[in-house]
Amino acid sequence: NARKWMWDNDRQFDELLEIVTNATIGFLVLQARAGADALMLFDSWASAVPAHFRQRVVIEPVQKIIAALRGEGIKQPVIGFPKGIGEGLLAYCDQTPVDGVGLDHSVDIDWAAANLPRHITLQGNLDPLSLIAGGPSMHRAIDAILGALADRPHIFNLGHGITPETPE
């Protein structure tokens, strides 16, 4: 269990986090130089990180990654996706220099519109399962997202990945 290992092996965990952070920096530099219009940091397991570790394990690596990108002259916008941290998005947006933040489908879109900083572009957050349901319920969900975010920068997207059952 990775979380137990994090608790039991402080120094080794920090070393691993440093390796992953540096690899991410290298990868994103290559993506940017290859012509990517925007860069996205997927932290799909952010919700598994206990709140008191979030600064060290989620926020500080993002700070380091974006600082390194800017130090390399990379100007593309960076979107962070700390899946499942709910109201922790406030600290994430305030403490990291992300240009945008991905919202998973569990985030209340009205809360996000009212509480997250307006200078940060929001991305998401249609429930991927709504694509399977389709029809009027899917259209209502789409309309709710578009309505809540009509007056701020927004990238319409799913709140997480497409499932294998999704029709083509």
Show the residue positions of the predicted features.
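Active-site loop segments of alpha/beta catalytic cores
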Residues: N1-E168
